[in-house]
């Protein structure tokens, strides 16, 4: 009886730990999807498909800033190899193999976002600010994101 209780308790603890790590993967996916949506909004404004909207620009930058602050905490060794449930993209194992390079990519993104804050006032300044942000996103995705299938 005691053995059954101990085994059951160990299984519950293990399942809880795995679920907590999967939550980090899911949070990362949500942040990336939010980034993508905001880049689409900013891109539409920059292309003249939508009118300039300072509130939308500020909201996007706020979300990018939050992502930049959260990203360093979302890739502990314990999530290596875990896949998101609802995405065709996942974290590349290179994140852990090339950690210093990955951390530099995150820092580049944070620097690009920080450089844009308070400087975007119209379409022209938006276009200028989007270039380094987009470049930082693209570099990291090219190096540290895997596509399934």
Swiss-Prot record:
<feature type="binding site" description="covalent">
    <location>
        <position position="137"/>
    </location>
    <ligand>
        <name>heme c</name>
    </ligand>
</feature>
<feature type="binding site" description="axial binding residue">
    <location>
        <position position="32"/>
    </location>
    <ligand>
        <name>heme c</name>
    </ligand>
</feature>
<keyword id="KW-0349">Heme</keyword>
<feature type="binding site" description="axial binding residue">
    <location>
        <position position="141"/>
    </location>
    <ligand>
        <name>heme c</name>
    </ligand>
</feature>
<dbReference type="GO" id="GO:0005506">
    <property type="term" value="F:iron ion binding"/>
</dbReference>
<keyword id="KW-0249">Electron transport</keyword>
<dbReference type="GO" id="GO:0020037">
    <property type="term" value="F:heme binding"/>
</dbReference>
<keyword id="KW-0408">Iron</keyword>
<keyword id="KW-0732">Signal</keyword>
<feature type="signal peptide">
    <location>
        <begin position="1"/>
        <end position="20"/>
    </location>
</feature>
<dbReference type="InterPro" id="IPR012127">
    <property type="entry name" value="Cyt_c_prime"/>
</dbReference>
<dbReference type="Pfam" id="PF01322">
    <property type="entry name" value="Cytochrom_C_2"/>
</dbReference>
<feature type="binding site" description="covalent">
    <location>
        <position position="140"/>
    </location>
    <ligand>
        <name>heme c</name>
    </ligand>
</feature>
<dbReference type="GO" id="GO:0009055">
    <property type="term" value="F:electron transfer activity"/>
</dbReference>
<comment type="subunit">
    <text>Monomer.</text>
</comment>
<dbReference type="InterPro" id="IPR010980">
    <property type="entry name" value="Cyt_c/b562"/>
</dbReference>
<dbReference type="InterPro" id="IPR002321">
    <property type="entry name" value="Cyt_c_II"/>
</dbReference>
<comment type="function">
    <text>Low-spin monoheme cytochrome c.</text>
</comment>
<keyword id="KW-0479">Metal-binding</keyword>
<dbReference type="GO" id="GO:0022900">
    <property type="term" value="P:electron transport chain"/>
</dbReference>
<dbReference type="GO" id="GO:0042597">
    <property type="term" value="C:periplasmic space"/>
</dbReference>
<protein>
    <recommendedName>
        <fullName>Cytochrome c-556</fullName>
    </recommendedName>
</protein>
<keyword id="KW-0813">Transport</keyword>
């Amino acid at each position: 009886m005691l053995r059954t209780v101990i085994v059951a308790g160990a299984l519950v603890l293990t399942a809880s730990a795995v679920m907590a790590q999967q939550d980090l993967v899911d949070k990362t996916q949500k942040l990336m999807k939010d980034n993508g949506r905001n880049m689409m909004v900013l891109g539409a404004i920059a292309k003249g498909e939508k009118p300039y909207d300072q509130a939308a620009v500020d909201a996007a930058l706020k979300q990018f800033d939050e992502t930049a602050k959260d990203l360093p905490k979302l890739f502990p060794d314990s999530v290596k190899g875990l896949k998101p449930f609802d995405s065709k993209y996942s974290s590349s194992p290179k994140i852990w193999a090339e950690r210093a390079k990955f951390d530099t990519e995150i820092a580049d993104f944070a620097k690009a976002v920080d450089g844009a804050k308070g400087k975007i006032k119209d379409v022209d300044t938006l276009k200028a600010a989007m270039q380094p942000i987009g470049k930082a996103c693209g570099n990291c995705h090219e190096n540290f994101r895997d596509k399934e299938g």
